[in-house]
Amino acid sequence: MNQSLLAPYGNPIERVNAALSALRQGKGVLVVDDEDRENEGDLIYSAETLTNQQMALLIRECSGIVCLCLTDERIKQLQLPPMVSDNNSQYGTAFTVSIEAKQGVTTGVSAADRVTTIKAAIADDAKPDDLARPGHVYPLRARPGGVLERRGHTEGTVDLMKLAGLQPFGVLCEVTLPDGTMARLPEIVEFAQQHDMPVLTIEDIVAYRNTQ
């Protein structure tokens, strides 16, 4: 990881604290993983505070595959089975079947419809019957141990929400460039400056949790 690009955002603990403050204010944060892993940056919002405008930004500036990071408990509450029985993806990303709210949506594709689906899935009294399957929102199951168990964006997202005192559910999407290629750290930092968002790494979250 090119730490010089991250230096303006402080040390690892300061970067996490800045992200937690932004999330509590309903803002987005950018989380990058290691250069020898996916080497990608994800734009992350709290599912609890997510707005239609923020979803529109995710769809417009990112890959379009908007994922909802959920705890194992919530996955079980919603009875969401894994997308495949034998997950042989490179990093073991734990996709479940995709979902759509049964009420309050049209085709399910618009920013507003996707937000409606996410709010239905994270409601305290959410039931399996509240959701149609498949749909246009892609749930991801976070490992119970968070980034200390798996150093992925899914776990980093849920860990950040817990550390911020929010519901343990977050929304992520990979930042892409106008030509469709993946944004790397220099472009992530530029994106952060344009949108006034903090930047941090998965390793920062690991370091922060190890101080708890």
UniProtKB/Swiss-Prot annotation:
The record marks H136, E174 as: Essential for catalytic activity. Homodimer. Binds 2 divalent metal cations per subunit. Magnesium or manganese. The gene is ribB. This is 3,4-dihydroxy-2-butanone 4-phosphate synthase. HAMAP family: RibB. Its cofactor is Mg(2+); Mn(2+). It comes from Shewanella pealeana (strain ATCC 700345 / ANG-SQ1). Catalyzes the conversion of D-ribulose 5-phosphate to formate and 3,4-dihydroxy-2-butanone 4-phosphate. GO terms for molecular function: 3,4-dihydroxy-2-butanone-4-phosphate synthase activity; magnesium ion binding; manganese ion binding. Keywords: Lyase, Magnesium, Manganese, Metal-binding, Riboflavin biosynthesis. Mg(2+) 2 binds at E38, H153. Its EC number is 4.1.99.12. Belongs to the DHBP synthase family. D-ribulose 5-phosphate binds at R37, E38, D42, R150, R151, G152, H153, T154, E174. InterPro entries: DHBP_synth_RibB-like_a/b_dom, DHBP_synthase_RibB. GO terms for biological process: riboflavin biosynthetic process. It holds the Pfam family DHBP_synthase. Pathway: Cofactor biosynthesis; riboflavin biosynthesis; 2-hydroxy-3-oxobutyl phosphate from D-ribulose 5-phosphate: step 1/1. Mg(2+) 1 binds at E38. It catalyses: D-ribulose 5-phosphate = (2S)-2-hydroxy-3-oxobutyl phosphate + formate + H(+).
